[in-house]
C-alpha cells in the first residue's frame, strides 16, 4: 500500500501540534496506520542589524530571529483518509506538504 508523507513547517509549535492531533484523529477514525509525528530539528534564522540608521556612533546591534519548527508524519494512503486530510483547516503561518510514496 502507498504511504503519504506529510511534512509540516511553521513558526508556532502549538499550531503544528494541533494539526498533528487532527491528523492522528483522522487516522484513528478511518483505521489507517500512522507513524509520527516526528519532530525534526528547529531551524533558526537570525538577522543582525545596526540600531543606528546613519552609521555614526558606537556599533550597537539588534538581533532578530525566527524559528521554523518542523514535523513529519507517515500515514497509509487510503483515499478516504487523504480526502479528510485535505480538508483540515491550516493556519496561514503553517505550510503543509503531502507526498505519496511507494
From Swiss-Prot:
Gene Ontology cellular-component annotations: small ribosomal subunit
The keyword Chloroplast appears for this protein: no
GO molecular function ontology, one term from the record: tRNA binding
Database matches in Gene3D superfamilies: Ribosomal protein S10 domain
Quaternary data: Part of the 30S ribosomal subunit.
Function: Involved in the binding of tRNA to the ribosomes.
Protein name from the UniProt record: Small ribosomal subunit protein uS10
Designated gene of the protein: rps10
Amino acid at each position: 500500500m502507498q504511504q503519504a508523507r506529510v511534512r509540516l513547517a511553521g513558526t508556532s509549535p502549538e499550531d503544528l501540534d494541533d494539526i498533528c492531533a487532527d491528523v492522528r484523529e483522522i487516522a484513528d477514525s478511518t483505521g489507517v496506520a500512522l507513524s509520527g509525528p516526528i519532530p525534526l530539528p528547529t531551524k533558526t534564522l537570525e538577522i543582525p542589524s545596526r540600531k543606528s540608521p546613519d552609521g555614526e556612533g558606537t556599533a550597537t546591534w539588534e538581533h532578530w530571529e525566527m524559528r521554523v519548527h518542523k514535523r513529519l508524519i507517515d500515514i497509509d494512503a487510503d483515499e478516504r483518509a487523504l480526502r479528510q486530510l485535505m480538508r483540515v483547516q491550516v493556519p496561514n503561518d503553517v505550510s503543509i506538504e503531502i507526498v505519496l510514496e511507494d
